[in-house]
Amino acid sequence: MEEFKNMKARNIGPAGMSGRVTAIDAIHSNPEIFFVGGASAGVWKTENGGATWSALFDEQPILNIGSIKVQQSNPSVIWVGTGEGNPRNSLNLGEGIYKTLDGGKTWKRMGLEKTRNIHRILIDPTNPNTVYAAAIGNPYGIHSERGVYKTTNGGETWERILYTNDTSGCAELVMDPSNPNKIIANMWQHQRKAWNFNSGGPGSGLYITVDGGKNWKKLGKEDGMPAGPMGRCGIAFAASHPNIVYAKVEATKNGFYKSEDGGFTWKLVNSDPAQITDRPFYYQEIYVDPKNENRIYDIHSTVTYSEDGGKSFQTMIPYNGIHPDHHAWWIHPTNENLIIEGNDGGIGISKDRGKTWRFDEQLPFGQFYHINVDNEIPYNVMGGLQDNGSWRGPAYTWIDGGIRNYYWESLWGGDGFDVVPDPTDSKWVYAMSQGGSVGRYNVATGQTEFVRPPAPEARKKMRFNWNSGIALDPFDNNSVYFGSQFLHKSTDKGTTWSIISPDLTTNNPEQQKEETGGLTLDITGAENFNTIMAIAPSPKNKEVVWVGTDDGNVQLTKDGGKTWTNFRGKIPGMNVGAWITQVQASKYNEAEAFVVSNDYRRGDFAITVFRTKDFGKTWENILANKGLKGYALCMVQDPTEPNLIFVGTEHGLWVSLDNAKTFQQWKNDYPSVSTYDLTIQEREADLIIATFGRAVWVLDDIRPLRAAAKANGAAQTTKLKVIEAPTAYQANFRNAPGYEWSTWGLFEGENRRRGAMLSFFVNHAADTSKAKADSAVVKFYDDGGKQLRMLKVKADSGLNRFYWNYDTKGSRFPGSPKPRPGANEQGGGWPVYPGTYKMIVTLGKFSDSTMVTVKDDPRVPQPRAVYDAKKKMFDRLQVSADKLTAAVDKIVDAEETLTKMEGQLRGAEGKDVDSLRKETTKMRDEIKKIRESIFGRTASDRQGITRYADITTQTILGAARQEIGGKIAAPTAQTERLVVEAETAVTESVNRINEFTSGKWAAYRKLAESTPVKLFKD
């Protein structure tokens, strides 16, 4: 969408609650430079220990990161494995391994696309073209592209060197620091289904090679490993004593093992379940202090450490320290005090061996499940994040600077999901955490009300999804819907509930067993199944409600819940049992709905959004063969232009301008990130984008897209088209709280620019005359046709966007440079009063116009009488200021003449010349005195600060100007006095200049004309 290149979304954060970090590596010779990979955030680099960051991977087609490895012999070479190795229900899959040769400026994919998830990369330090990749594979799929892969030619070709079966991947891969051919791998058999996870099986185990993977030995009971099935294992060599190796082993009985012969034989040293392996499927990594073979770090829900070789562990980072759920760990190989760790909420940095930690608040890695908006001015966005609760923050602010982390307010704990503002009182929101824990929260007071629907009877078990469906009734502000296996409705904001449906799921007992985990149970509600995920009441018919379930049912009632129709197996192209992630009821047609489904959890990556226009009699997959990438996650149809449709997929944002006939990816600095939810703030026509990995983005004012969609995406036939303007507010901006000054380390999301946001399209190809005009002239008029302001703005092909600060034509300040021919008109005049103004844009011989509505700050409206009185006084004062400017121009011209005269006199001789030279110096002195009376003394030649407190014409004029513009109230007698004083001072200065030019300057000119120097011209 090149024609919209000047229309870019703003990333507003937050970063105070970041997201899952899966990979960390640093340059050993300069550890201030390190790299962080987010589960779905891309690769980020800091060159100053975390003070500032830059994104390195945003131009790539995928941002889901599993591993990072820097080639220490040449740190410009970096390898990145995509697809995270933490196979929870919300994992993000990958598409191969990437390599950069220039420190991340450019990247090349080096294969292994079908492995889906690469959890670890090793580089042979003696031969960096030899690289190993641990492919953990797709936990939802059964496929052979798993195990350990090796390249000996820098990634040009790969060989799979370790494989056990189609559900086993490599979960850990470690290299002996003293022998790069000696590697230990953990092969892990595991499989995830939407309702179940199983860890362990015959494909699991520890394998060791001493010849770079040509031959492997599986370590068994005879080697000290546990008998029976094994699961996920963490492995770590002690760099200071490489014969010492540790393994954290998931088995029938989990244990911590130690080898003292380099990994060939093992002994159990700890099997205390309170200390070992709480959630091995999600985190099972261990690390050894590089200088102390007995000090071990175990990263899991918390971080614990051992000082006695694993016999006992104590807490280093508690559950409420930094953030729980730790996935990545890096220790400097020669400075054991420097540690960087990654968790579900970002990264922590320690420089004292873990005694204290600094949380980095600049990485906007938030994984949002949902997004919503209220109707405040400025409006707020709100939503819930994976493992980071639910939050509300401003889409833009009337505060100086950017959108800071502490502008965001925590609403609800746990894993956060949908947040819905009360339409009658935006201080109240509905918010929830996992498993249907829904409540109402007052943002102003913190008052909380839990409103989860009760079971219909005491012993009836309710099933709530990890991410339960909720929706407001568009016809009744007091009514809300909520989903379990039933559809619940409350007509009193959740105080009481009624069930208005039967069980709308498949209600399959085999999918409700709560036995998930395999060798180690992990029953957290993440695998709750046969539940309602999506609820969509029609805004056109109060009796119509659509429901989508996680087990593939699409249900419809047309009578308020009395009867239901299930479309399971009746939607051509939709797999029976596919996950229904979203349903959208049309704002245009009560019979129309969109169903967003995906089936990647069963290995099918088809991209599907189905539409019906006849209550489900017929269906169409509107994404079929349209070139989109990544399975579909969400969609929204514009509420005023039906041709405009947005779709979010696992790999970015896509836009249709022709009612889903075609789609294009929206880039314009927006990355190919997992785009999880979309909504439109209707009053301001903003698209709000919730990403699962890069927090929240706002695409301001989508009216240009509406205009293009109105033409079905066809090319503009005229050279110039002005777009309808959004309402603009003359807002007062307050000072930012918290910090007066700050260094690096303070995150600021991008704020909306000040001023009226205005847009126009240019199609240079439509001008057959080929007349060149690279800038447009913009003029603003009041309702009486008076021109108020003129601007010149750049006119690129495609969309152009600029901002008007509500100012009228201004005047030059006394002594300021005269404008160059063709320069932009002087701005800074008295701002316009709230109202409607006409804007005409002219490009060559083409013109188009629109109306611009300017509104007052709703917090502090200004009465028209006050505005008029202040403007009248300002205009009166400006008359004097203009007189002074014109007068000062005379002495500026005289100074320029003196400079030229001094140049001509330099080196000249003669009595007349000497006399003229003396008079020239006198003229300089005279002008200096005049200048000082108007502007004050200039800085001394001596060193130091010189701020003279001179009372001058300029200070008197400035005091009057400040009195008018700096006061809220209408002008007073005090204002009148200051203006009169300014007028008097200006008159005195103008008279003094006129006396000088008609007297001493005229005499000087006469003297100069009598000499051979011919400078003056009539």
Feature names for model-found ranges:
Residues G483, D796-F802, G828-T836, F846:
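A glycine-anchored, Pro-Gly-centered beta-turn/N-cap motif
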Residues G439-Y441, L758-S759, A766-R789, T836-I840:
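Beta-strand-rich binding/interaction modules
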Residues N575, Q787-G828:
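Glycine-centered tight-turn motifs at strand-turn-strand junctions
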Residues G810-P814, T842-T850:
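Short acidic/polar inter-strand loop motif in beta-rich domains
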Residues P704-R734, M851-K883:
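Low-complexity, Pro/Ser/Thr- and charge-rich linker/hinge segments at domain boundaries
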Residues V852, A886-D1018:
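Mature extracytoplasmic or organellar-lumen-exposed domains after removal of signal/transit peptides
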Residues M1-L746, R753-A756, N763-A765:
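Beta-propeller blade termini and top-face loops
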